[in-house]
Amino acid sequence: MANQEIFDKLTNAIATQNVAGCAQLAQEALDAGISPLDIITKGLSPGMKIIGDKFEAAEVFLPQIMMSAKAMEAAMKVLTPELEKTKVEGEEGTGLAITFVAEGDIHDIGHRLVTTMLGANGFDILDLGTDVLNETVVEEAAKHKGEKVLLVGSALMTTSMLGQKDLMDRLREENLRDSVKCMFGGAPVSSKWIDEIGADATAENAAEAAKVALNIMK
């Protein structure tokens, strides 16, 4: 099977919530000599984008999102051990990544993928999970003041994305803004929005997120 054919099948498996098929295809891709990173960026991530776009357009609903998340999780169980083999310990530019999904949002497909990629690139991880209050994020940032800290928030819905502005405001109020870097992602997040709220960066996919994170933490 050609690589592109495998990628297309992976994309379809995510978009159609095929949990068992997604895990099997991930293993087939590894067996074919495809790197875990390519499997994620060229196979799984496009499927996540499809399901995210359909959710925004109200073409699919929460049950489908949850099943796509399970399909992604099944694939990542296969891929994570391979990613761990390439993990870079103590590389300059890394630090503590505090990852979370915005308050009011429980859609963690992209969040889990980004968290995995950051860990594979040498970051220590503090995963706060989904539906996280801004107050909780600020408290954790305060606990680690003086360390190299990257806040990584994701939002699939426009409504939950708006909370990112409130988080930035709270960080400034608590005099924490200068002690952390802030990166946000998710379907509705744009570079224009990042500039508007005064954050540091965004990324279109998990692989890019890891590269951007390493760069801004140097």
Swiss-Prot record:
**Gene3D superfamilies, from UniProt?**
Cobalamin-binding domain, Methionine synthase domain
Which InterPro entries does the entry mention?
A: Cbl-bd_cap, Cobalamin-bd, Cobalamin-bd_sf, Corrinoid_p, Met_Synthase/Corrinoid, Meth_synthase_dom
Q: Where is the B12-binding domain?
A: 94-218
Keyword Repeat in record: yes
UniProt-listed SUPFAM superfamilies: Cobalamin (vitamin B12)-binding domain, Methionine synthase domain
Annotated GO molecular function terms are: cobalamin binding; cobalt ion binding; methyltransferase activity
Q: Which NCBIfam families match?
A: pyl_corrinoid (TIGR02370)
Q: How does it assemble?
A: Can form a complex with MtmB.
Which family is annotated?
Answer: Belongs to the methylamine corrinoid protein family.
Described function? Acts as a methyl group carrier between MtmB and MtbA.
Question: Can you name this protein?
Answer: Monomethylamine corrinoid protein 1
Question: Which organism does this record belong to?
Answer: Methanosarcina acetivorans (strain ATCC 35395 / DSM 2834 / JCM 12185 / C2A)
Gene from which the chain derives: mtmC1
